[in-house]
Regions:
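FAD-binding core/adjacent interface of flavoenzyme oxidoreductases
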Residues: 1-78, 149-172
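Rossmann-like dinucleotide-binding cores of NAD(P)H-dependent redox enzymes
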Residues: 66-67, 72-76, 82-157
Length: 172
């Protein structure tokens, strides 16, 4: 599509020189580019939580989940939003035992409540398990997996072990 539409892809830090010129700084140095229109795609990054140190090996973001070399036997998805549920659904179909932990009392809070309930039923039929109204209070990665401590809304604490933890509480 880029070639067909005569679009040049650039990567680096950019700033506007004027309305039709940008200066791009990259590992190759600085260079000015002129055009009638520019598309600026800054991308996004996963929201971090201090108690959950991401290493992209055992505790991963959606980016790391796509780079896993093998299907984990068990996967905990932290966050019941669109990205985490999509990733969880895929890994479940590939053979992973997937559990989703969500701090709220339902998944995908921006979705209509009735539709979200039906969506959750569908995901349960695929084999996903849910821990709603639970929050992760700590994680500890080790050779045999990740130990995850969670607390329910009634302050009961549980600790479980997973091969991989997917941190999916949002992007910024």
């Amino acid at each position: 599509l880029f070639k067909k539409n005569k679009i040049t892809h650039l990567q680096g830090a950019a700033s506007f020189v004027d309305k039709k010129t940008i200066k791009v700084s990259s590992s190759d140095g600085e260079k000015n580019y002129s055009a009638t229109n520019f598309i600026i795609a800054t991308g996004s990054s996963s929201i971090a939580i201090d108690a959950i140190p991401v290493d992209e090996k055992q505790i991963v973001t959606s980016t790391g989940a796509l780079a896993l070399e093998a299907v984990p036997q068990s996967l905990l998805v932290i966050g019941g939003g669109y990205i985490g549920l999509e990733m969880g659904s895929v890994w479940s179909r590939l053979g992973s035992k997937v559990t989703v932990v969500e701090a709220l009392d339902r998944i995908v809070p921006t979705m209509d409540e009735e539709i979200a309930k039906e969506f959750m039923k569908s995901l349960k039929k695929q084999g996903l398990e849910f821990k709603l109204s639970h929050k992760v209070i700590s994680t500890k990665a080790g050779k045999s997996g990740v130990e995850v401590s969670m607390e329910s809304s009634d302050k009961k604490q549980i600790t479980e072990k997973y091969n991989v933890v997917l941190m999916s509480v949002g992007r910024k």
